[in-house]
Amino acid sequence: MASVKDFSDMKARVLTVMATRSQDQEMVEKTARMYPTPSGQDPSNAPSRYVVPAFGWHPWFSHQLFDDRDKQRQPDPVEHYKSVLVPAPEDEDFLRSLPAPYSLKEFLHRTEARLTEFPFALVGEVGLDRSFRLPEGPSAMTGDVSSKTGGSEGEYTPGSREGRPLTPYRVNLDHQKPVLRAQFELAAKLRRPVSVHSVQAHGLVFDLMQSHENPSKRERKKKADTTNAHASDKANNGPEIEQSLPFPPRICMHSYSGPPDALKQFLNHTVPADIYFSFSTAINFSSVSSAKAISVIKAVPDDRILIESDLHCAGETMDKLLQEIVHKVCEIKEWSLEDGAQKLKRNWIKFVFG
């Protein structure tokens, strides 16, 4: 939050700022109020800087939620964490260091209110993660001082990891999946795009999408016959069917790390959403995986590619990372810098605003 003021000095004129856990939701809301998305005009051509907020619960923190949508009783914190973490922790000190679990039902209620208040807000960052391990010890608290990367010195974000050693404990995927599905359903209800974090879980994310496949022509015709619909085929393919699908309209696979072959699955016409793929130098070009990222970027359709900094601090470093990834994508795609920048801008506008 301390680096937000550095946005006013950045070359970037629009930032998409995403929540990840309980402490972030209000911070993102405050930032969106400081730099409101313009209304009454095309936001993509606004003359002033603005923030597109995104509200969601990241899989790294999904253990902090308990699913009470079908029950009222709040679980015992220790028993809750033993049931959602693998292996089940026996370390009492570690268990006591974890925050009291938060109601998924309440989180969804509050998130819907925020999404309603901010009509251009996204759902994110959400997703699935097989590899993440919880850090040791208590999380950073408000008032602890941090030197922000590329931004101003200020407080740690409450609840953050901030370089602590990792434990052997992971969040059970059987717990992560209903948390993700619930947020997908909320995004579908309000027709909002979603940013998805997926690490070693692209197949599981795809399975979730596949569980809500677009109906085939035969299925649409059968539905129309059953309901005695006399509208044209075009009408049957339109808003009524779209609204009946419990799925978001657009999904971005954030800092996509999957193989090129998986793109065909995500881009299949049966997937009930327009899938975009974003890339960052911080994630996609920071290791030996760079060669894979190059082959993936070459294979992504020109109108489905996005770029990002994947940095938590506004300021010069964020500008630098954004510039680097624009140059990298243009080089790989063999676009001129000017043409590539315009393509990426159009893609972002289409993803965010539809």
Task: Give the location of each predicted region.
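An N-terminally biased module of ancient metal coordination in phosphate/nucleic-acid-related enzymes
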Residues: 1-55, 66, 116-244, 251, ...
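Glycine-enriched alpha-helix->loop->beta-strand junction motifs that scaffold or abut catalytic
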Residues: 13, 245-250, 267-278, 301-304
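Histidine/acidic-residue-rich catalytic or RNA/ligand-binding cores of hydrolases
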Residues: 29, 205-209, 263-267, 289-294, ...
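Fungal intrinsically disordered, low-complexity polar regions
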Residues: 74-87, 143-155
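Glycine-rich anion/phosphate-binding loops
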Residues: 94-110
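Short loop-to-alpha-helix "cap/lid" segments that border enzyme active sites
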Residues: 231, 237-241, 259-269, 286-299
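Short acidic/histidine-rich active-site segments
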Residues: 303-319
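Mid-to-C-terminal alpha-helical segments outside catalytic/metal-binding sites
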Residues: 320-354
